[in-house]
Amino acid sequence: MSESLSFRAAGRSDVGLVRKNNEDSGFIGKHFLLVADGMGGHAAGELASSTTVAIVAQVDNNKEKLEDLDSKLIEIPKVITKELKNAINKDSSRAGMGTTLTAAVVQENQLKVSHVGDSRAYLVRNKQISRITKDQTYIQSLIENNEITESEAKNHPQRSLLLQAIDGITESIPVITSIEIFENDKILLCSDGLTNVVTDEEILEIVNQFDYVGAVSALIEKALENGGPDNITVIVADLQKEKYENKIIVLGAAAEARNRIKLPGLEFPTDIHPFITSEFPALKSVTWLRKFAYVASFALIAVIISWGTTNWISKQFYVSNLGDNLAIFQGVNSAIGPISFSRPVQSFNLEVVVLTKDDQEVLLKGIKADS
């Protein structure tokens, strides 16, 4: 008789060093692991990946829905498609929204994965790594046809072109994969913000070096070290015979209140890992204020140049949050219109959520540091 396994998992989502918003979402539930990489303008990507978390979390919380697991894994993208279609109908600016889906669930000694898009699931066993999923991209089709190499794909101009995604328009049929799993196997789910800048060999080295918690942080830091051009979401799970009940964790866009309140028809899980900005929803833009901000930006730039204070600004440093983590910024903690007077220079493997609410509020304002 096969032995039932359970998983201990950790995850983290980071906005990266280039993007302004995090369109990735992640979920660690009682049974499910999930990474969703949203896409689309006007914050639609955040809503698409957040919707995916809400739908998967509902299935995760319902034991009856897990009885016929294969059919549920096929049904999940259909439900997400319906919700995205409703969201687009309510607001036409959301047209073009979409998301990837890589959801994994442990059932006794089997791992079942439902996959759409180019987020990935990996298996690490006996210090070897293998991909459970296959990227549904134009680039992957070229690689399989031996038209380009994996190395050439890294710099290909169409490397981000998806052949499959959940978009609220066409019905997506996920690829369902089932593999036998063993104690001490590790499962890794991630968005392409990791795999575009960190190789499989580097991922394996890090996962073998750290436990599942340390591996998550080390992988995120490696992606940031390599430029962090995209949002990065990583979940690592350690499979054990010992019964283990995970606390529910929501990552990235789905953890932000400003995204949840735009999806009033969906029920989100109560999680232990709220994003720091969850109590500070973004303010709606005001046209006249935006115009004023742009005019003021150019005026301020002229003043800065005339006063010769650029050198002074470059010598200022402060501590604040960069996504989920603490970071040091060079410059001053202010911006007018599109002009920011600071940039992140170092991110630390220390999550903001460990701070008290009072300390988080202080951190949001920035803590001046000596140069």
Per-region residue spans from a language model:
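Extracytoplasmic/periplasmic/luminal assembly and interaction segments
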Residues: I336-S371
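PP2C/PPM-type serine/threonine phosphatase catalytic domain
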Residues: M1-A296, L300
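Aromatic-capped interface at the extracytoplasmic side
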Residues: S306-N321
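Loop/turn residues immediately N-terminal
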Residues: S119, G193, K315, N325-L326
